[in-house]
Amino acid sequence: MAKHFITGVAGFVGSNLARTLLENGEEVVGIDNFSCGFHKNIEDILEDPSFTFYEKDIRDIEWDSGYGDFDAVWHLAARGELYYCRDHIDEAIDVNVKGSLNMLKFAACADAHHFYFSDTSAEYDNIIGEENYPTAETDAPNVNTPLGYYAITKMAASQFIRSYGIANGIGTTLFRYTNIYGPSMNLKRDIPPVVGSFTNKLFDGETPIIFGSGRKRRDFLHIDDLNSFHYAAFKNRQDKTDSQTYNAGCGENYEILEIRRLVYNACMKIDAGVSGGVIYKPDQPNEAEITQADISKAKSDWGWAPKLSIEEGIDRTVQNLWQLRGESNDS
C-alpha cells in the first residue's frame, strides 16, 4: 500500500482519482478549500478508513505540517476556468504558480518519491494549422501568437516543477489534459464544460448555446478513461529524478456541433423529453480552433489507451446526470 496526497480532492478529477486509488488498496490524504470543489463529490469516501480529508488551501499548507511522508503527491488544485483567469490574473498567478511552488516544497518535506501535476493542453492552443495536429508532448507553443493567461500560469508552474524536481530528487510527471467530461464535472462555472452544458440545457427544456459557428474541433476524454490513465501513470512511475510529460486525451477530435448532436441523441435514448435547436452567440476570444492530443507516448510507455468511444462516453454521462437529477428531485 502506497500513501498519496491529493490537492483539489473534492473537484471533478480529484475525487475520481481518490476513488480510483482507494479501490486499488491505496491510502489517500486529500485537501480542498471548496473554491471549485464540492463536498458531495467526496461524501461516499469520507467514511473510508483509508481516506483522510482536510479543508485546506494549497497556499496555506505548511511544508513541515505533520501530515507525514508520502509516496506520491498529486497536485490537481488550480483556478482552471479560462475566463476567470483572464479576469482575475493576480489570483490565477497566486494559486496556479505560487500555490504549485508551495506544494513542491511540501512534497520535498514529505519525502515524496513522485509529484504529479495537472497541466493543460491549452499550452498548444496557439499552434496554428490543422497539419500540426495531433500535438505531441514535444511540440512547443507558437511564440509569435499569445496564449491565454490560464495556459501561461500552467506553463510557468510546469517549468518550476521540472526544475525543482531535478534539483531535489523528486520524480515529476505532468499531465496535459484535454476536455475531460463525465458525471460530477463542475456545471456551476460561468461557462460550464460543453457536454454538461448541453445536457443541462436540454434537461431544463432550454436551448443549448454554441459560441461561434460550432465548427471548432475538440479532443474529449471520459473521466473513466482518465482514471485508468492516472493509475497507469502511478504503476509505471520511473526513477526518482525522472521528469516526463504525457498528453491525456482520446487522440481524436469532434466538432462542437457533433457533440451537441450526440448529447441530444443520448437524451432521446432515455426519454428525457428534450427538444431540438441551437442558439448561436459570438465566438469567445483567444480560443483554439482545434485540439487533438497525440497519445502515443502513454500507449508506448504504459500500454494505456482509452476504452470509451465518444458516443459511449456521452451516453454514459447523460444517463448518470439524468439519474442524479432524479435523485436530487426525490430528496
Residue ranges and their predicted role:
Residues 1-180, 304, 316, 320, ...:
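N-terminal Rossmann-like NAD(P)+-binding domain of SDR-like oxidoreductases, especially those catalyzing
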Residues 3-4, 57, 102, 203-331:
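C-terminal substrate-binding subdomain of Rossmann-fold SDR/epimerase-dehydratase oxidoreductases
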Residues 28, 35-36, 60, 90, ...:
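Alpha-helix N-cap/helix-start and coil->helix boundary motif
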Residues 35, 78, 188, 238-241, ...:
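Flexible interhelical turns and helix-capping residues at alpha-helix boundaries
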Residues 37, 87, 95-98, 148, ...:
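Residue-level signal for the nucleotide or nucleotide-sugar donor/cofactor binding architecture
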Residues 127-134, 159-218, 223-235, 251-253, ...:
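NAD(P)-dependent short-chain dehydrogenase/reductase
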Residues 129-141, 187, 240, 269-274:
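Short helix-coil transition/hinge motifs at the ends and kinks of transmembrane helices
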